[in-house]
Amino acid sequence: MRDPLSSTIKTIQPSGIRKFFDIVSEMKDAISLGVGEPDFDTPWHIRDEGIYSLEKGRTFYTSNAGLKELKIEIAKYLDRRYGMTYDYNKEIMVTVGGSEAIDIALRAMLDAGDEVIIPQPSYVSYVPCTVLAGGTPVIVELKEENDFRLTAEELEAVITPKTKILIMPFPNNPTGAIMEKADLEAIVQVVKEHDLFVISDEIYSELTYVDKHVSIASFPGMKERTVLINGFSKAYAMTGWRLGYACAPETILKQMLKIHQFAIMCAPTTSQYAAVEAMKNGDEDVAQMREEYNGRRRYVLHRFKEMGLKCFEPFGAFYAFPSIKEFGMTSDESATKLLNSKKIAVVPGTAFGECGEGFLRISYAYSLDDLKEALGRIEEFVTELRAGMDNK
């Protein structure tokens, strides 16, 4: 019998994020700091709206592009938060999480062989989605000495005549890096000069801890060449509701909608009604959760400093990315040893690209009690490793 599988799909590796999570779920007294999921419940008034929609029998398909009411609220949100104006009817669509939006944007925009510039370390979906869309990933290694920000010089160095899209993964998973206005201005100049398009993944836009998030789409001349992707999972603690959105020029959005129609039909109806409430009345919930995350962020950095573990200061998302290079182990070896010896699960930096070697991703989207216990065990681990090195 001939091989039933696509040669392309066989080149795609499973996500490295879930590997240690699956192991720790079967391990007694283990603590996972590996999954990027808020530990908060979805705020009650948002859940209540979802329940009410079910009680009212709102269980039918919505428009392929999403509920009109939700798209209107998304447009209002973008205007009040970032001063950006989008036509809810032509430039906004609701997706099954931000991940679907990434996938269909790439499929709608790429021809075979088109190059997509992907800064790494970054979210695990960008490379496989590019490959599955027929594109060619071109990796830019973000450097710790640049605060894991993308520089115009790094971008310029990898552009070729085949380059079509730049993915902007900021605030960044796994590093927590952000791009400030001055950083983006330099990138915008290069993008315009080379006539590139941008897919800006802004799922952590509400979780920034210095100033306010700046969207690359807000710069003059950039809205028409940017697909802005966001969602409800991180800011509103709605991961299981599976809801995101894409904002793009009508010419791009129409083609994204084709793929969405045939593959998905529409995003979950109940989730969309709940999201209307989140958009209307969720700002205070987001602010409270952001404040809590910021307290945890400061605590994690303080503890790393106490144990002498080098860690770049993250200003976005809810991750820390400490360096373990001093111990002479790979990221995977270090994460495995930490799990087996101290029952703490983290994610090797290499899950987010080869340039993540020498780092671990630690999520602080966990209770302070769990963080205190976990960091105590990590300190023991670090102390034992250093003692072992001294005895050699």
Regions found by a protein language model. Name each.
Residues 2-5, 10-13, 23-27, 31, ...:
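PLP-dependent class I/II
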Residues 60-61, 204:
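Intrinsically disordered, tyrosine-centered linear signaling motifs in cytosolic regions
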Residues 56-58:
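Conserved nucleotide-sugar phosphate-binding/catalytic loop shared by glycosyltransferases and other
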Residues 61-96:
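Conserved N-terminal alpha-helix of the aminotransferase class I/II PLP-enzyme fold
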